[in-house]
Amino acid sequence: MHLKSFEVVQNVLTFLIIPFLGIIVGIASIPGVWMFLEARAYLVDQVYWLELFGTGISLGLACVVWGITLVLMSGLLGGLFRPRLEPGRYPLRSFVTIQWAWSMVFHRVAILFLPVLVPSFVGTIYYRMAGAKIGAGCQINSPHLNDAGSVVLGDGVVIGGNAIINAHLVEKGELVMAPVKIGKGALIGGNSTVQPGCTIGEGAVVANRAV
């Protein structure tokens, strides 16, 4: 479906999304803020050096709790709102593009802290919540598995640092959507790029910085 006033819709939604992102970040901060305030209530009557160290440590821990909460919230929301689109080519100026862009908003929020959490089980949980199918023993050392709901990783896959996995691209006025499938034991080198529609065989190696 083409949208005749696509730019207007795009600008209005962008204006609305910015405060929405602030709300998500704020809600995610609640556990960390609570922990910090509880620590401050205890530390305020302590000797100065203990109050100083305790405040610094509690601030640091609160930031970590905020980041983990933000990433997991983003994964949950991204999974709930991800578009169930069939592989294909869609007009860029269409409602499909708006659906896709909306789902990517949550990944952009997660990237505020996700780079700190990869590779780790928290990062893997995030990608699974966002819709990725991830086999056992995978190591994901990148915050750039875009369109997670269209990514399939077999057992033992290794994604190198800052590798980019895209299940979408834009060309000739169209949004192209196609799943990415990576077979068991494959290695995707650091800073490499895998484009939509790629199927990488079992045990294959994609060199660093390859496209």
Name the predicted role of every residue range.
Residues 1-128:
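Terminal amphipathic alpha-helical/low-complexity segments used for targeting or macromolecular assembly
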Residues 126-129, 133-211:
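Structural signal for interior beta-strand "rungs" in well-ordered beta-sheet cores
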